[in-house]
UniProtKB/Swiss-Prot annotation:
Known role: Acts as a ribosome collision sensor. Detects stalled/collided disomes (pairs of ribosomes where the leading ribosome is stalled and a second ribosome has collided with it) and endonucleolytically cleaves mRNA at the 5' boundary of the stalled ribosome. Stalled/collided disomes form a new interface (primarily via the 30S subunits) that binds SmrB. Cleaved mRNA becomes available for tmRNA ligation, leading to ribosomal subunit dissociation and rescue of stalled ribosomes.
Species for this entry: Escherichia coli (strain 55989 / EAEC)
Protein name: Ribosome rescue factor SmrB
Matching SMART domains: SMR (SM00463)
GO annotation, biological process: rescue of stalled ribosome
HAMAP family: SmrB
Source organism phylogeny: Bacteria, Pseudomonadati, Pseudomonadota, Gammaproteobacteria, Enterobacterales
Length: 183
């Protein structure tokens, strides 16, 4: 451990003499802005309403025309078929995951609606929905529900690393993100 160097009496007197008449500097060059609250803190009531609104699109009576041969896939008419190819190849990696194992059809619809609402709110354009194998009820219904939602651009059977034929990768249409205004 190093010893502190002490100043001699002469050096201390010289220092006090040189510092006589000085005053403390007022900090006026850097202004620290107050930290803003996170935008993602959404009230619970709004989350419940978004979930209910998003699950409104899912009907059990309507049967969209989906290709039954090969892997499960869908592309909205106004979207390029190349997007489904990108999903199949794994070019998009999902940021949000939803596991539907053990849920009823009603619960699964509500959770799908909540997932789509969360993707739009958080500006996430790719999500993974794991429906599992089970009794094939959710496996059959999930693509039918997703094809009905207007914000679903495309979906494709997930690559092996995301669940294979027991999961779907979904492309969600998100609004253009603008940074919040600094005031």
């Amino acid at each position: 451990m190093k010893k502190k160097t002490t100043l001699s009496e002469e050096d201390q007197a010289l220092f006090r003499q040189l510092m006589a008449g000085t005053r403390k500097i007022k900090q006026d060059t850097i202004v620290h802005r107050p930290q803003r609250k996170k935008i993602s803190e959404v009230p619970v009531k709004r989350l419940i309403q978004e979930q209910a609104d998003a699950s409104h699109y899912f009907s059990d009576e309507f049967q969209p025309l989906l290709n039954t041969e090969g892997p499960v896939k869908y592309v909205r008419p106004d979207v390029s078929h190349f997007e489904a190819k990108k999903l199949r190849r794994g070019d998009y990696s999902p940021e949000l995951f939803l596991d539907l194992h053990g849920l009823t059809q009603l619960q699964a619809k509500q959770e799908l609606g909540a997932l789509i609402a969360a993707c739009r709110r958080e500006h996430v354009f790719c999500a993974c929905v794991m429906h599992g194998h089970g009794k094939h009820i959710l496996k059959q219904q999930t693509p039918l529900w997703l094809a009905q939602h207007p914000h679903v651009m495309a979906f494709h059977q997930a690559p092996k690393e995301y669940g294979g034929d027991a999961a779907l990768l979904v492309l969600i249409e998100v609004e253009e993100w603008l940074p919040p205004e600094l005031t």
